[in-house]
Amino acid sequence: MMPVPPSVVTNPPRQWDRCAPPTIYPDPDIVIVDPAFNDLLVGLNAIHRVWTGSIWAEGPAWSGQGQYLVFSDVQGNTQYRYLWETGEVSALRKPSYNSNGNSFDFQGRQLSTQDFFRRVVRWENDGSMTVIADSFEGQPLNSPNDLVPHPDGSIWFTDPPYGARLSEGHPDFAGGPTNPDGRLNPLVGQPDAGAMGGKSRVLPTNTYRWDPSGRLERVLTEEQVPDPNGLCFSPDYKTLYVVSTGKGPGDKVGGNNVIYAFDVQGSKLTNQRLFSDMIVDGVTCGPDGLRVDVYGNLWSGSNAPLGYAGVTVWNPQGKLLGRIRLPEVCANVAFGGPKRDHLFMTASQSLYVLQLLTQGAAPG
C-alpha cells in the first residue's frame, strides 16, 4: 500500500486511505474564518479522499445527464471518469492529448481543452468530437487551459502557455519561446505533434470568447490579465472571475496569483477590479480553478504550502469565509452529485470530495 500523506493539523496525524479510522466531527481540516461559512457546511461530515493515482489532477466537471464526474490527469495524458453510483474511477480517454480544463454545456456536451493540440474541443452527444478553436487570427493558440459555457451558447476560455512543455503536451518547435535553441524534439515519442505543422507560440496570453457562429474574439488582453487560468461566471452571469497565475514556460513576466472580476456586457467585459489578492495569514494561496455556488460564493483551488494547500472560499464581496485544508496542492474544483451539493477537488495525485449545504450554480 502506498504511504498516505498525514494531515497538516491533527495529532496523531490523519490518515486519508479508505481503511483509515474515521475523522472526528467537525472535521479539523475545515477552517472557519467567518461564521457565515458554517451556513455552507454539513457539520456531521468530513473530507474524503476517494481516489489517488494521477500525476497532476485537473479539470473536474460534473455530467448531470450521466451522473459522473470527469477529470484530467494532465501529465498522465489520461481523462478519468468517477461514477457516482459505484464510486469507481476508470480511464475515459487515453490518450487524452493532455486534456486540462473540462466543463459541460447547457446541452450536456463535454467541453475540454487539450494541451497537446493547443485547442478547445467539444464531445458531441453521439460520441463525435468538434474542434471549437485552435487558432486566433491565423496564429495557433498557446495552450487553452480552462473554459466555461454561457447560456447564449458561447464558450469563454483562457489561453496561457502552461501546456507548451514536454510534461504537459509538447514544447514549441525550434525557435519558439519554450525551445529557443531547438534542442528539444517535440516529435520524439509523440508523432502526432507533427499535426501542429512546426508551429510555435506566437500569441500573447489572452482570454477569448467563442461565439456559436464560429467567430472567436479576444475579450481580455495579456496586459489586462497576464497568464489567465481558471475562470467562472457569477450565478446571474453578470460577473466573470478570471485568475492570473504565475510565470509560465517562455514567459518574460508572468501573472501575479490574484483573482480579477469583470462586469459582463454581452460579449464585452468592463470594470476590471481586483477581487482578491489571495493572501491568507501572509501566505499566497495561489489560485487556479474556480467555481461559484448558488449564493455567489467563490470556491478556488489553492496552490500553497502544507497548511494552506486545498481550497479557499470567498463571499461575493471578496471576503474570506473559510478554507479546506488538503494534504496536497489543489488545482481545481467542481460541484457534483445528484443534488450538486458535493464539492469535488482535484489535488495533485488525488480526488477529494466534501458534502455541503450549498449547490453549484452552473452546469459542469
Stretches with model-predicted labels:
Residues 46, 52-67, 95-114, 119, ...:
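Beta-rich, blade/repeat-based domains predominating
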Residues 48-51, 90-94, 130-134, 218-221, ...:
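Beta-propeller fold detector
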Residues 64-94:
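Beta-propeller domains
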Residues 78-80, 119-121, 205-208, 258-260, ...:
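A short loop-to-beta-strand structural motif that recurs across blades of beta-propeller domains
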Residues 304-364:
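C-terminal closing repeat unit and adjoining cap/tail of repeat-based domains
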